[in-house]
UniProtKB/Swiss-Prot annotation:
GO terms for biological process: D-ribose catabolic process. Homodecamer. This is D-ribose pyranase. Its EC number is 5.4.99.62. Catalyzes the interconversion of beta-pyran and beta-furan forms of D-ribose. Belongs to the RbsD / FucU family. RbsD subfamily. It is an enzyme of class 5 (isomerase). Substrate binds at residues 28, 98, 120-122. It comes from the Bacteria. Pathway: Carbohydrate metabolism; D-ribose degradation; D-ribose 5-phosphate from beta-D-ribopyranose: step 1/2. InterPro entries: D-ribose_pyranase, RbsD-like_sf, RbsD_FucU.
Amino acid sequence: MKKIGILNNEISHVISKMGHTDSLAIGDCGLPIPEETKRIDLALIKNIPTFMDTLKSVMMELQVEEVQIANETQDLSSELFKEIKKQLGHAKITFISHEELKNNLKHCKAVIRTGEQTPYANIILKSGVVF
């Protein structure tokens, strides 16, 4: 039995297979996920698990060089955006429209669906390298 890090086998598997510039998304419970994209559904009940708990856990295991965040997240969920920025370290933030973010989900290795119910609690993480 794995004793540290992410215990969810689907998330752990996706992260371990990611290469430089591959993408992984984390979203709120309302984010529409394309049929062709792997869905890892963690949503249990309202706000469990939270977007931030999920992001923090993934960031512990995935080297991230850039993220895509919807403009609406910064504008309409500013408190959440402040928390996101704290977790990102030196990762570059690229702002795009919410529609563009939804369109980019089809290029992600997977989308992790959380129980989050904060509007625009969505992010695309682009993998970096550890060397």
